[in-house]
Amino acid sequence: MVDFPTRFDVIVIGGGHAGTEAALAAARMGVKTLLLTHNVETLGQMSCNPAIGGIGKSHLVKEIDALGGAMAEATDKGGIQFRILNSRKGPAVRATRAQADRVLYKAAIRHTLENQPNLWIFQQACDDLIVEQDQVRGVVTQMGLRFHADNVVLTTGTFLGGLIHIGLENYSGGRAGDPPSIALARRLRELPLRVGRLKTGTPPRIDGRSVVFSVMTEQPGDTPIPVMSFLGSKEQHPEQVSCWITHTNARTHEIIAANLDRSPMYSGVIEGIGPRYCPSIEDKIHRFADKESHQVFLEPEGLTTHELYPNGISTSLPFDVQLQIVRSIRGMENAHIVRPGYAIEYDFFDPRDLKYSLETKVIGGLFFAGQINGTTGYEEAGAQGLLAGANAALRAQGKDSWCPRRDEAYIGVLVDDLITLGTQEPYRMFTSRAEYRLILREDNADLRLTEKGRELGLVDDRRWAAFEAKREGIEREEQRLKSTWVRPNTPQGEAIAERFGTPLTHEYNLLNLLSRPEIDYASLVEITGDAVDNPQVAEQVEIRTKYAGYIDRQQEEIARLRASEDTRLPVDIDYLGISGLSKEIQNKLNQARPETLGQASRIPGVTPAAISLLLIHLKKRASGRQLEQSA
């Protein structure tokens, strides 16, 4: 074996969405970082659907962006269609979604990586970890080259023991065209960590030249075109294109039902559990037998290819059945399949064996992020990657770890759910998972997180200057609206009265008027003049004003709960010795080893009464130690 001459502070294994964000985060924080990938050409590759964002997911993308990450800016540079989902609903559940050109997105990520100071990239698969006395010391590559670092972030995606299924045939692979990580999977199974198998899948890709779009429903992007990054602008976007909607039908369902015995999922060949919220088409037909059709979205893969991604018909059925399925769908009667769909099974590790920092509890300096933790989705992976990379850097600097709370970020919700509850199926983020979603909107991710990102060293001068200008702009505009008055029987007063449908009875300041449901910011400044030129400032002023009462109530609730949420539980606490706790709860707490009282309260089966007993125990323990010190 040969030792690489440079010693690193942090090594990141894997160049997908988790790995790239992890490596960039650590390097931005000033530590010497190595990104080890099996193929430099696939850095930032979108292995599944060509899209970023969506319900719950865009909140994560905006939080990554607020902390200086790359995903949102790469989306603005590679996005070929942008839409706001839930635009008619409240701001808490609105979400930005973008179709991305695979080539442009990947190029944007690679450009960011290659221009990041403190970051080295090396092409080699990782086969082994160097571990000494329960502390990671480095990694060993496929060719026996040893890289040394006391902090290693594993972001292996679907590569650990990856097994690809098409019909009843299967073969080893990390994804189509890439080898799996067999040696590393074997090495990780030797560690005292709980391991399981999960499964995900992808649909066949279609040649757009063989599709009849005229019989489908066109789905254009939104106008005006949204942006994903807080620093983004629509001028960055390439050419914008439409998606197309068609549907499965009775014939499609008959074909699938007649061939379920050839499905690896239904014949017992696949052991791993698939994603509940992104089921295969055979799973949909089986689980929702009463439905006569299912939507299929034809999504362009890019501007320089004819390939289409038929979102909604992920499948692992044999190729001959896939061809029948595709050609049974309206508009695709003569479609040509460019690549077959497939399912992939892979190893994941129980995230309950992780700390909030995403460091494993049993091996110091070893961090996990992405699908290795049981999640699904680029956005979930990127969020974990950024957090793991930042905490690996903090550890290298001898500083305390950091993780946002559930009331601070969707990243906090994601991590808390994973390490407290674990997961038996691929975990996907939804806004419904957050208790405080009115506070955790996608539009205010920067106001929630950028200041902390700056403190950690994640946020550069360009982003910080833009953030400060926005924050000051919001305060200035709110103050202006508060101090500007409209009186009855004036031209402005009459215009406002006409909008309300009733005369003004007394004078109002503009902030009071904006809080009324009948008027929005654009209409208000149309009447009174002096609009701000930053649309993000205008958006924040309007949301904060209209939802002030609800936001204040949620903030009060958060303040009440924060005391118990932040109460740390000692690492050496003996739950078996706490009288009053049932054996079941003692065992649950002993196994989970929660870090805070708040986390303990979310463990299934741990009752409010048990939390009260824990609090009493902590107070007794603290007073006992004070007596010892005074004696």
Swiss-Prot record:
Chain's role: NAD-binding protein involved in the addition of a carboxymethylaminomethyl (cmnm) group at the wobble position (U34) of certain tRNAs, forming tRNA-cmnm(5)s(2)U34.
Subunit structure: Homodimer. Heterotetramer of two MnmE and two MnmG subunits.
Cofactor(s) needed: FAD
Sorted UniProt keywords: Cytoplasm, FAD, Flavoprotein, NAD, tRNA processing
Assigned protein family: Belongs to the MnmG family.
Binding of FAD, residues: G14, G15, G16, H17, A18, G19
Signal peptide: none
One Gene Ontology biological process: tRNA methylation
The keyword tRNA processing is assigned to this record: yes
Binding site for NAD(+): 274-288
Protein name per the record: tRNA uridine 5-carboxymethylaminomethyl modification enzyme MnmG
Matches recorded under SMART domains: GIDA_assoc_3
Compartment(s): Cytoplasm
Lineage summary: Bacteria, Pseudomonadati, Pseudomonadota, Gammaproteobacteria, Pseudomonadales
Pfam families, per the entry: GIDA (PF01134), GIDA_C_1st (PF21680), SAM_GIDA_C (PF13932)
Name of the gene: mnmG
GO molecular function, one term: flavin adenine dinucleotide binding
GO cellular component: cytosol
NCBIfam families named among the record's database cross-references: mnmG_gidA (TIGR00136)
